[in-house]
Swiss-Prot record:
Binding partners and assembly: Homodimer.
Function: NADPH-specific quinone reductase.
Gene for this chain: mdaB
GO MF term set: NADPH dehydrogenase (quinone) activity
Keyword field: Cytoplasm, FAD, Flavoprotein, Oxidoreductase
Superkingdom of the organism of origin: Bacteria
Name this protein carries in UniProt: NADPH:quinone oxidoreductase MdaB
Catalysed reactions, as listed in the record: a quinone + NADPH + H(+) = a quinol + NADP(+)
Cofactor requirement: FAD
Entry keyword Cytoplasm: yes
Length: 192
């Protein structure tokens, strides 16, 4: 399988981006050992928009590695999305999917990457209970509800969702070795 790894880690403020870079490297190591072909982009290091479009055409699956900043992706990841996906019109998506015969139906079905998949690998300082416990901050709804927009932007291209990987408590109670072991197990289960 051809897998594109997108590293959205960024040094900014009190965040140094190191955990996301470390998880990105672990994914490359594990997926290569499993026999997959891997291409990668460290978003904050810069990228060529046309080369990134070609990577999306090449890949069978993309893994978005990123921290949560203020309940969503860092601005550098959003900029990458705006530049790469918008310029991918005609290659990554044809249209929004609607037709003049019935313009109220079919929105989001114009993607050209059907059969390909996406996965999120996220780092949060929030404890897992903030996502899973009723009455807690995220009302027991889980992390994927917060990332519906992100899943939908991938779906707009035609990609289907793979199970999300989540590291919790990354500042207050970091467990880096456990995160790496859990991520390896997750990758082996999903891509093994």
């Amino acid at each position: 399988m051809n897998i594109l790894l997108l590293d959205g880690g960024k040094a900014f403020g009190h965040s140094h981006g190191e955990l996301n870079h470390t998880l990105h490297k672990k994914a490359k190591e594990v997926l290569t050992a499993l026999g997959h072909n891997v291409k990668e982009t460290v978003i904050d290091a810069g990228y060529d928009v046309e080369a990134e479009i070609e990577k999306f055409l090449w890949m069978d699956a993309v893994i978005w590695q990123m921290p949560s900043w203020w309940m969503h992706e860092p601005w550098t990841v959003k900029k990458y999305i705006d530049e790469v996906l918008t310029n991918g019109h005609g290659k990554l998506y044809h249209s929004d999917g609607r037709h003049s015969v019935n313009p109220t139906e079919g929105y989001g079905t114009g993607g050209l990457l059907q059969g390909k998949k996406h996965m999120l690998s996220l780092t949060w300082n929030a404890p897992i209970e903030a996502f899973t416990r009723e009455g807690d901050f995220f009302e027991g709804k889980g992390v994927d509800v917060l990332y519906m927009h992100f899943h939908k932007l991938n779906e707009f291209l035609g990609l289907t969702r793979l199970p999300t990987f989540l590291c919790n408590d990354v500042v207050k109670s970091p467990q880096v070795e456990q995160y790496l072991a859990d991520y390896q197990a997750h990758l082996e289960k999903v891509f093994g």
